[in-house]
Amino acid sequence: MGTAAEVRMVLYEDDSVQVNYADGSTLQLSPCGSEFLFEKAPPPSTHPLEQPERIRQRTHFVISNYREQLQRALDFRNSSATCPFLSESIIPSERKKRVFIDFSEVEWPSPDRDDCITYSESGIVKITSLDGHAYLCLPRSQHEFTVHFLCKVSQKPDSSVMPPETKNRVPKEELVGKTRNVCRSGRLSGQRLRNKENEPPRQLLTSKNASANIHCVSETEGREELPSPGTKRRYVHVWVKQSWSAASCPEEWKYPLSLGLRFYNKVPAASAADAEVPVSGIVTSDNPEERGTGVSVLPRALLLSCSAPHMHRWNFCDSLLQRQSDAEEYSYPELIKVVWYKGVTYRLTHKNVNSIEIFPGDGSVFKSEGTHFGNYFTYSSQDNSGKREEKTYSVNNLPPDRPGNLYSVRSLIKQATRILQHCAKIRLSLSHNYRVCCWRMAPGVNVSSILPVLLKESLIPGVGRFLAYSDDKVHAVFLDGVTLTLNWDLSSSAEKTQVDQGLRLRWCRLTFPDGQDQLIQTEHPGVYERYVTSVVTWCRRLTQTSSRHVSPRLSPVPEENWSVASELEKIQKFNWLLENSGVLNLTSGKKNEQCSSDHCKPGSSETLPEATNEESVSVALKRTSEVLQDIDYLLSLTRK
């Protein structure tokens, strides 16, 4: 069975994957990677209302018809995923490696070591870990880098009952004690020095408190003893390749990346081509944040089976007619992490604002810039001689395509703009469940603790209802049926609100009564200015009020308890207000006058307290019923 070529591959923030093929078929991977859904392309003679054929299987038990496509989809997922999924049954044997130890971290060389940093003729710096279990490659452009590391294959759930700390520990019978010098700090336990035989000590510092006082103590270190064949268990590991942007480097790769960047900063491009370049001249930075740590904790592979398969969400069209009418390219309700489209890679970050980087594949990069997302794109490239070229493109004034160019700048930027617009809609939607996925749900974790809570709710007469959530999302419902959603940093100080520092995303989402929505720039709202101004003013007032309190954040609004006790508490408050308002005194005076005129016997009311209470309750209920009927009548008139 021939396999069609991939046209678009999308990796979302929850590590789910969607692949579109040239023949119209699609493949979707669950966030954990343990399950996939393949939707075949319908033949041309298919009725428009006929549903396409779908195959849903476990990844570990994939049949041969979809093995090749699934392998490429998993490689794309693992290249930028937080935790890889490595099924031993579908991984080629040349990528597997059997070792006698189960390790979870690697140690990188100090900057004064020149035997672990190499420079190739193609202009790539390679930094190898001391144990050889990982290495990082940084090209001359320094825009992106690749890292290769050994990772243990995915295990069955029953073999992963032990905690990670216990599983990563080598058994005592496999260890032979030897003495080592450990460099410790009185303030920082992560600082240490490791010694191997006949090697000088290497100081490995974490990213914080690098100037802490250091003293060395003697300790027993485990040394791995080579087991005899057939007596010790061998662990299957797989070489995993990941690609990252240098501007948004994960924490575990910051230290080796800093070594590669210092190599280019200290060694000129002309002398870097020389194979005899001394790397020992590279010194560490005085800034501990830039230095990072010398030990990287490797990503761990997910389990073969998912513990929450009910959370797998599949996106597909029910018919060919719906597929043709749906023009949305990215319809999955999740933020996008990486897009591969016709050989071009798009990488996104969602820290404070949505930003995107375009890697055409020739060593150059396009980066989104500007106050609003994607208003401008900066182009940067570097040739073999080290000469850099930079340009700036405006989204509203893109250059025409030129014959002979490797790619169309107009097409690349337009595609990036569509991706950014999708991410803006997701960030401005009220579907808060996009933060929850199956592999993040550890046993015993409450989903409600992950979802945002309501912080503030206000009902403004004549305007509408305003709500603020803990994920910095503000939602407003106006009286005319229009709803507005924007992101506002509720922890921003009142002094900065005049420049709208609290406005995290310079866009807002308007939803009209007919269900249509539209993205509006908050600084240029046009005819929707009154909606945007009302919400921004309310957010400013909210941050000013919260800044006067001791707590930097607003406290969550407690949920109403619709129990009998709460209702009785409301009745008691109502009675207290009624007694202190003077209404009861007025009615009691009228009753006394009526009793005196009718020559009532004194003490008659006291002799029958139960009858009086029952009568007063019945009268109150009757009046309440009449008031409710009047309210219902008025509401029915307004509806007409």
Curated annotation (Swiss-Prot):
It comes from Rattus norvegicus. Residues 594-614 are annotated as: Disordered. InterPro entries: C5orf34-like, C5orf34-like_2nd, C5orf34-like_C, C5orf34-like_dom, C5orf34-like_N. Transmembrane segments: none annotated. This is Uncharacterized protein C5orf34 homolog.
